[in-house]
């Protein structure tokens, strides 16, 4: 009897799998169970994060089902491509377009934050257009690093993607929702000039720039960008998370809600810089910030030791 019931369940799984595969409305990532702890995945991804989310700018998880070998996540099917790819392909692109994009993303992140969810890995590769239509909405995807935040708790696990990670994460301090707002500041900066505010081939130098909040609005790339846009970015890229704008403050900024964004075409400059700067693998890879910071500590300890040794040698010579 158990074998018959098992066979029926497997047939149902196969039927459901084929049904979803043939659906135009949904996509279905599948994962081998050896790579996933099924119970944790269902509890964490479905119930604690994606299972509670319903927003027009967030890819929705509709259901989870499994068979003996695989776990299936039934999600929205988005076919419009990645954010930067679409911008590069456009014939016209303005500051107002960037403002509209950021407004949609802010609305979604504000919704997540109100539900106690921190994305923790906001970056252009996780921002997808819903359809190829010119007026398609933007969607937030990839909640692999997302975490729910209790009212009285702060997170401490260092994670993210190097160029978008907030200073408090690199300092290995407890952090909260403000890390998403920092990442949005980085994304907004890139949308308006085509290159990142913080960059260096050396991780140590990159992290040092971020922790100091060291960036510029360089000429000529920012000459045609409004002061309102620059002020908006400055409000998000505050090193002190207590001084950083939250989503609601950002949504109320004149550049987002007050019509301050310019409508001059900046496509040529922005798309050229995007093509130059964003085919670099290191900007597309998530990283373990704890391991990275440990490497930096070792480098610092080594440098301090070398300086101490040099100082001792000089003292002996004297």
What do these predicted ranges mean?
Residues 1-41, 313-318:
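Intrinsically disordered, low-complexity regulatory segments that flank or precede the catalytic domain
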Residues 5-19, 231, 248-314:
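C-terminal regulatory tails of eukaryotic serine/threonine kinases
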Residues 63-64:
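A short, aromatic-enriched beta-strand patch in the conserved N-lobe beta-sheet
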Residues 69-82:
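Conserved short submotifs of the Hanks-type protein kinase catalytic core
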Residues 101-102:
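Activation segment signature within eukaryotic-like protein kinase domains
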Residues 180:
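Conserved catalytic-loop aspartate of Hanks-type protein kinases
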